[in-house]
Every structure is written in structure tokens, then in C-alpha cells.
Swiss-Prot record:
This is Sodium-dependent neutral amino acid transporter B(0)AT1. It holds the Pfam family SNF. Robust expression in kidney and small intestine, with minimal expression in pancreas. Also expressed in stomach, liver, duodenum, ileocecum, colon and prostate. Not detected in testis, whole brain, cerebellum, fetal liver, spleen, skeletal muscle, uterus, heart or lung. The gene is SLC6A19. It catalyses: L-alanine(in) + Na(+)(in) = L-alanine(out) + Na(+)(out); L-cysteine(in) + Na(+)(in) = L-cysteine(out) + Na(+)(out); L-glutamine(in) + Na(+)(in) = L-glutamine(out) + Na(+)(out); glycine(in) + Na(+)(in) = glycine(out) + Na(+)(out).
Length: 634
């Protein structure tokens, strides 16, 4: 077993001893918030972990990588990668009783960059994540009408036909790309601000501010709704979905295993990435949430419970989504068949009702035998239920195009639309609680505003600042900017941060010290499983996933999909290359948080090297005194 521990002088002076923890907890009662009860804490963590990615990415990956076969690598990596890191974040936050910045600064001053990296990543992800919530609110507002505005194409200016762009695509495509985003044909074509999206963005940030205005004191109340309502809606959708024609086609298609996919490296790497991102690890929010717990809270049990529910939710959502996708595919299959039947009836003047799906092939053969020349003139569509089911869509396309199209074909479609977007709103909002916590608490530790200022002011300034920056997402090119940030802000930086977190706890803080801390908090030491995963397995898996992502991103040209009515294959999306200046944006978005970790460590090393010996001795004495008094500023 690896027992390497790097030199870390002054650690005992920077962190409270185990004997002091209970006293510190009592002293914090009046100055630091605590959870009202265990349910608040668990619901908040679940809300942060279970987000929009569970709805629109996991089902896509399941379907793309062998259906039920994908569950095998997903569950294996859930156990070997997700749960150990979640347990580590819960335990270190509960032990050191600080936010992410304070935790890593306490472990070693040079690790302050790790907390800064988490804060920057939380900020950038929250920047675009709340824009998605604003889109959800726009669809929710438009759901309170009959018929739904994306049910039919609008008429053109002359009232003589449908708008050409809609007629060439579909009503759901047109409502999403034109009436919602009013999208341009390039990220370079910024266009103007769409006022309706700006108003929705303002509403989204206002709601978030009201829910996070006093930290866990307000979010702890909100999660009773935001973290439980999605499960109620999902269950309602499952019951409704299973009663729809063709729902079982989707579920069978989803879980039909293709075991050959298990031999593909991409399957395992995508499973590892999905486990990692679905837990919202490395944002700093989970560390902050756990720091408000009692010293003797059983963080091991919490991590296992949250992990099991998170994994169960991913599978549960996939079943719900593909029951609806199965219904949609069956509807499209029936429409396709109806078109072919009509073609045959009109071509041979057959009586209506004489041709059905069951006898269609037989009627084709009869017509072909009776008049081969006339039959050869007919053009039939290819109707394949598996082809319709295979049209895998992830991300916003699943929520705002595929699901909305399926909803329009349901009876009482406005009701189902309202329920669906309320569910998405709750999932997105509860995830944003963790992102805000990952920004607010580190900024408090940095003392960017005077300590006497109330938390409401800091939270308000953050919401206002991010709202103003978010104007870029309300431009005609806003969706392209959001996709860019989604691809790079919440991927490579999080992998680097998570790897550094585990390395720092195991080899800088010391895994033996960590084991003793946990034994003090929960009554027993972590077993051999946790030892092996923390020391070797989990860091190795994260390193492999990071290297894979890095190699793929560096070796491939950066491209993105655009919506261009002038494209010859419209309504298919067109893939084009990013302009060169986007590479600078990618470096800023992915590189700055990642480089903050070694950058601050180098800065600290140079500063300590240049410091006079007498000053260094005085600094250590000051730090020790401040730590004992609880006044240490990070």
C-alpha cells in the first residue's frame, strides 16, 4: 500500500485538532449557519448532483453505447470513481469546517489555487447554466396556451401559406431556433439582444437570488420543493408514458444490450466522464454544504446514499425519456406509413380503408403485378421504427425539440408541457444552488467585500454581475456561446481539480491523518475499499479520462453546429469550423481555472523564497496564532 506523504510543515497549526472540533462547533452556533435537519442537507446535495445532465445526457449515452450494456461500465465506474471522490469531499469539508478555498488553504497555503480554480469553474458554469433555466422559463410561460405555439407553423406575411423556414423544417424546430433563439448562422454574427430572452434571464437570476439570498438558510427551505418535485413529475410522466402507443418500443430499444460495445474504449471513457460530471464534483459546493454538518455526522453513509439515488435517478430518467421517445418514434412511423398508403391509394385509385399497415406489402405486390409501369412511378418513403428510435439527441435538442414534439401529440398537451418544464426548472435551479455556494463562500473567505456587509449584498452583486455578463447569451449567437462554454468550462478544469483534490488529501494532508479524522467523526476507520480507491484507483481513472479528453480536443479541429436555412441539406445542422479567435476564448475558459492551481503554487514558492528568514518566522507565528483564534483569512 502506498504510504507516501509529502512534507507539509505547519499543518498542525493551520487546522484545528480533533479535540478542538466539538468546541469549535459549539462556538460556531451563533456565527456560522447550520442545517435545520438532515433532510435539508441530503435534499440540497441531491439537488446539486441530480441536474439537467441526468435528463438529457445519460439517456443519449445509454442509447449510443449498447443500451443496457452501458450500465455495466457506468455502475463499475460509479463505484470506483464517483463514490470515493464524493465521500472525500464530504469528509474533508466536515472535518475542516470551511468552504473549498478555506479547506485547501488549510491543508497547504500553496493549494489556495485549487480553491480559486473551483470558484472560477463554478462561476463560469453558473454563467451559462442559468441561461438554460431562462430558456426553460420561456417555454414554461408559453405552455399556458392551447394549442401550444410549437404545434403548428405560423402563416407567412401574405397569409397564403406557412413561413418557408418552418415548412422546410418543423414547427418545433422553428419555434426553438427562430422564435426562441432567433439564431444567427455563425458565432461571429452576434446580432442584437433578444428582449424576450433578456427578460427571462432577468427572471431566472431574480429567482435564484431570492432562493440563495441567505445561503443555506433559504436554499434549505427551497429544496423541499426543487429536489422532490422532479421525482413526482417523473413518476407521472412514466405512468403516462407507459400508456402511450409505442412506449415499450423505446424502452426495449434503450435496454437491448449490445455487448460488443463493452470492448470499445469510448464506452468506458464516456461512462467515466458521465459518472464524474453527474455528481457535480470539484465545484466546491459539496465541500461547503458538508462543512455545515455536525462534527459527528456519518458522511460515509451520506456519500453512499447520494450516490445510489443519483445512479438510480439516471436510469429512472432514461426509462421515462425513452418511453416518450418510443411514442414519438411510433407516431412518426405511423405517419410515414400513412403517407405511403396514401401514395398507393392515389396511384391506383383504391378505395379508402382498403390498404392498411398489415396488408401494405401484399397490396404493393398486387399493384406492381397489375401495372408495373404505373407502380414504378410511385415514390415511397422508408419507414423503419428502429431508424426513428436511433435518432439519438442529447442536450438542449432533447428537451426543446424531441420532447416538445412528443408532447404536442399527447392529449392535454399544455398540461404535460407545463409539468415537463416545471420539472426541468426545479432540476436546474437546485443545481444552481450548489454553483452559487461554490462562488459565494470562497469570495467571503477572500474578503472581497468588507466583513460587515451582509451576505445578501455579496449574493446580490454576484447575481447582478453574472446577469450582465450573461447578456452575451441573449444575442443571436448566444446559443453558440453557450455550447462553447458547456464544452470547455465544465470538462477539463473539473477533471484537473478533482485529481488535485484527491492527491492533496491523500499525499499532502496525509491519508493516515485523514483516516483518523474520519474515525473520530463517524466512529470507525474507512475500510480497505476506500483506501485502495483513494490512493490508486480513482486518481488513475481520472488521469486516464483527462488524458483522453485532452488528446481528443487537441488533435481535432474545433467545430460547431449551426442552423442555416440556406444550407443545401437543411433542416440538418451544418458543421463548420470555429474562427481562430475562439481558440483564445477556449484557453481562457478551460486554461485559466486549470492553470490557477500551479500558478498560485509557483507564486507562493517564489514569495516564500524571497522572504527574509526573520519575516518567515514571524509569519509562521502569526499564522499559528490566527489559526488558534479562528481569525485566519484565506
Amino acid at each position: 500500500m502506498v504510504r507516501l506523504v509529502l512534507p507539509n510543515p505547519g499543518l498542525d497549526a493551520r487546522i484545528p485538532s480533533l479535540a478542538e472540533l466539538e468546541t469549535i462547533e459549539q462556538e460556531e452556533a451563533s456565527s456560522r449557519p447550520k442545517w435545520d435537519n438532515k433532510a435539508q442537507y441530503m435534499l440540497t446535495c441531491l439537488g446539486f448532483c441530480v441536474g439537467l445532465g441526468n435528463v438529457w445526457r445519460f439517456p443519449y449515452l445509454c442509447q449510443s453505447h449498447g443500451g443496457g450494456a452501458f450500465m455495466i461500465p457506468f455502475l463499475i465506474l460509479l463505484v470506483l470513481e464517483g463514490i470515493p471522490l464524493l465521500y472525500l469531499e464530504f469528509a474533508i469539508g466536515q472535518r475542516l469546517r470551511r468552504g473549498s478555498l478555506g479547506v485547501w488553504s488549510s491543508i497547504h497555503p500553496a493549494l489556495k489555487g485549487l480553491g480559486l480554480a473551483s470558484m472560477l469553474t463554478s462561476f463560469m458554469v453558473g454563467l451559462y447554466y442559468n441561461t438554460i433555466i431562462s430558456w426553460i422559463m420561456w417555454y414554461l410561460f408559453n405552455s399556458f396556451q392551447e394549442p401550444l405555439p410549437w404545434s403548428d407553423c405560423p402563416l407567412n406575411e401574405n397569409q397564403t401559406g406557412y413561413v418557408d423556414e418552418c415548412a422546410r423544417s418543423s414547427p418545433v424546430d422553428y419555434f426553438w431556433y427562430r422564435e426562441t433563439l432567433n439564431i444567427s448562422t455563425s458565432i461571429s454574427d452576434s446580432g442584437s439582444i433578444q428582449w424576450w430572452m433578456l427578460l427571462c434571464l432577468a427572471c431566472a437570476w431574480s429567482v435564484l437570488y431570492m432562493c440563495t439570498i441567505r445561503g443555506i438558510e433559504t436554499t434549505g427551505k427551497a429544496v423541499y420543493i426543487t429536489s422532490t418535485l422532479p421525482y413526482v413529475v417523473l413518476t407521472i410522466f412514466l405512468i403516462r408514458g407507459l400508456t402511450l402507443k409505442g412506449a415499450t418500443n423505446g424502452i426495449v430499444f434503450l435496454f437491448t444490450p449490445n455487448v460488443t460495445e463493452l470492448a470499445q474504449p469510448d464506452t468506458w471513457l464516456d461512462a467515466g466522464a458521465q459518472v464524474f460530471f453527474s455528481f457535480s464534483l470539484a465545484f466546491g459546493g459539496l465541500i461547503s454544504f458538508s462543512s455545515y454538518n455536525s462534527v459527528h455526522n456519518n458522511c460515509e453513509k451520506d456519500s453512499v446514499i447520494v450516490s445510489i439515488i443519483n445512479g438510480f435517478t439516471s436510469v429512472y430518467v432514461a426509462i421515462v425519456v425513452y418511453s416518450v421517445i418510443g411514442f414519438r418514434a411510433t407516431q412518426r412511423y405511423d405517419d410515414c406509413f400513412s403517407t405511403n398508403i396514401l401514395t398507393l391509394i392515389n396511384g391506383f385509385d383504391l378505395p379508402e380503408g382498403n390498404v392498411t399497415q398489415e396488408n401494405f406489402v401484399d397490396m404493393q405486390q398486387r399493384c406492381n403485378a397489375s401495372d408495373p409501369a404505373a407502380y414504378a412511378q410511385l415514390v415511397f418513403q422508408t419507414c423503419d421504427i428502429n431508424a426513428f428510435l436511433s435518432e439519438a439527441v442529447e442536450g438542449t435538442g432533447l428537451a426543446f425539440i424531441v420532447f416538445t414534439e412528443a408532447i404536442t401529440k399527447m392529449p392535454l398537451s399544455p398540461l404535460w408541457s407545463v409539468l415537463f418544464f416545471i420539472m426541468l426548472f426545479c432540476l436546474g435551479l437546485s443545481s444552481m444552488f450548489g454553483n452559487m455556494e461554490g462562488v459565494v463562500v470562497p469570495l467571503q473567505d477572500l474578503r472581497v467585500i468588507p466583513p460587515k456587509w451582509p451576505k445578501e449584498v455579496l449574493t446580490g452583486l454576484i447575481c447582478l454581475g453574472t446577469f450582465l455578463i450573461g447578456f452575451i447569451f441573449t444575442l443571436n449567437s448566444g446559443q453558440y456561446w453557450l455550447s462553447l462554454l458547456d464544452s470547455y468550462a465544465g470538462s477539463i478544469p473539473l477533471l484537473i481539480i478533482a485529481f488535485c483534490e484527491m492527491f492533496s488529501v491523500v499525499y499532502v494532508y496525509g491519508v493516515d491523518r485523514f483516516n483518523k479524522d474520519i474515525e473520530f467523526m463517524i466512529g470507525h476507520k474507512p475500510n480497505i475499499f476506500w483506501q485502495v480507491t483513494w490512493r490508486v484507483v480513482s486518481p488513475l481513472l481520472m488521469l486516464i479520462i483527462f488524458l483522453f479528453f485532452f488528446v481528443v480536443e487537441v488533435s481535432q479541429e474545433l467545430t460547431y453546429s449551426i442552423w442555416d436555412p440556406g444550407y443545401e441539406e437543411f433542416p440538418k445542422s451544418q458543421k463548420i469550423s470555429y474562427p481562430n479567435w475562439v481558440y483564445v476564448v477556449v484557453v481562457i475558459v478551460a486554461g485559466v481555472p486549470s492553470l490557477t492551481i500551479p500558478g498560485y503554487a509557483i507564486y507562493k514558492l517564489i514569495r516564500n523564497h524571497c522572504q527574509k528568514p526573520g519575516d518567515h518566522q514571524g509569519l509562521v507565528s502569526t499564522l499559528s496564532t490566527a489559526s488558534m483564534n479562528g481569525d485566519l483569512k484565506y
